Amino acid sequence: MKALVLGLLRVYRYAISPMLGRNCRFHPCCSEYAQEAVERHGAMRGGWLALKRVGRCHPFHPGGYDPVP
């Protein structure tokens, strides 16, 4: 499961993300955060952390440095 999620993230980061441009308000960007969260915590918990992060990534949030716990 973990390998599948990481593979999907890599496809997004290298095939889709360059076409969309860098729009993330955080550092590291949301896809880097998701990859690190899944590597550290596994597919379930890391995926949940990534979803929470993407939910915070909007124009009304100040953004900034937000490392993976």
UniProtKB/Swiss-Prot annotation:
Protein's cellular compartments: Cell inner membrane
Database matches in InterPro entries: Membr_insert_effic_factor_YidD
Gene Ontology CC: one annotated term: plasma membrane
Protein's membrane topology: Peripheral membrane protein
Pfam families (alphabetical): YidD (PF01809)
Keywords: Cell inner membrane, Cell membrane, Membrane
Keyword Ribosomal protein found: no
Protein purpose: Could be involved in insertion of integral membrane proteins into the membrane.
Family stated for the protein in its record: Belongs to the UPF0161 family.
Protein name, entry field: Putative membrane protein insertion efficiency factor
Organism: Aromatoleum aromaticum (strain DSM 19018 / LMG 30748 / EbN1) (Azoarcus sp. (strain EbN1))
